[in-house]
Amino acid sequence: MAFISFPPRHPSASARLPLTLIALDDWALATITGVDSEKYIQGQVTADVSQMTEQQHLLTAHCDAKGKMWSNLRLFREREGFVWIERRSVREAQLTELKKYAVFSKVVIAPDDDRVLLGVAGFQARAALANVFSDLPNSENQVVRDGASTLLWFEHPAERFLLVTDVATVNMLTEKLHGEAELNNSQQWLALDIEAGIPVIDAANSGQFIPQATNLQALGGISFKKGCYTGQEMVARAKFRGANKRALWLLAGKASRVPEAGEDLELQMGENWRRTGAILAATQLDDGQLLVQAVMNNDLETESVFRVRDDVNTLHIIPLPYSLEE
């Protein structure tokens, strides 16, 4: 099993992040290969993968029959199959569910621990990578392949890159950027995903939410025109009958502790506090600010005040870098 690890440090907000190499050990890789790969994955996820090019990656969801997400997947093509990235805590259970009908198809579904995941973000990340790779991804070509590496481009919260690569390439990059780049662990990438409004589904929240409750429709992760997939009826009903009353929100402020995924929050109601929502992810930045990603009612007032349960500090809503208007 290939593995990289960098010493932890408090993450920084994207606006003041120095050039940083990030070991994505809290994320994991999986693959589907075989002649039926596209047909099989098309029947299991919310996006229309038949429309995907080799230069695209997208966030999609793998749901149960009730339309609740086992996980969300960062999906892209590789040769005749597909690769996806998801939180390590959900991979085993998600793959078990995905394999349930695979006996009837010519596919092989497997975890991939031979490669490693590296984030490159912060000040002049593109320039740093341009010294190593001949071609870099961008908004037009979001996926680029270079030797043993596949590079994925992300726009939000600021330009950053995710490398699916081998340990030798990571060691080479670390050596080449020694003295220029800081090193950090998964918490830094988590902070950037929270800022970007990209839903983080860990084991505590697997099987809890329909995709729209995590804004996946605003991120291009749901096709309402494709054929059948597991959970489609419930996902479609949420859209066409207005059944979804929840959305993903970004909160920032202070707290005396970092809450866990699956915890609720408290909403201020006059002089009282009422429990609300479910936390998907939270992290504390190097300036002491707490970032929280939570699923809550989609009709909240933007001036609403929240807190971690029983805490003396407060949290406020921060705008996401995309619109929920359809």
Swiss-Prot record:
InterPro entries: GCV_T_N (IPR006222), GcvT/YgfZ_C (IPR029043), tRNA-modifying_YgfZ (IPR023758), YgfZ/GcvT (IPR045179), YgfZ/GcvT_CS (IPR017703), YgfZ_barrel (IPR048451). Its main location: cytoplasm. GO terms for molecular function: folic acid binding. GO terms for biological process: iron-sulfur cluster assembly; RNA modification; tRNA processing. It is found in: Cytoplasm. One of its GO terms (cellular component) is cytoplasm. The keyword Plastid does not apply. Folate binds at residues 27, 189. Coiled coil: none annotated. Keywords: Cytoplasm, Folate-binding, tRNA processing. PANTHER family: TRANSFERASE CAF17, MITOCHONDRIAL-RELATED. Belongs to the tRNA-modifying YgfZ family. Folate-binding protein involved in regulating the level of ATP-DnaA and in the modification of some tRNAs. It is probably a key factor in regulatory networks that act via tRNA modification, such as initiation of chromosomal replication. This is tRNA-modifying protein YgfZ. It comes from Salmonella arizonae (strain ATCC BAA-731 / CDC346-86 / RSK2980). The lineage of its organism: Bacteria, Pseudomonadati, Pseudomonadota, Gammaproteobacteria, Enterobacterales.
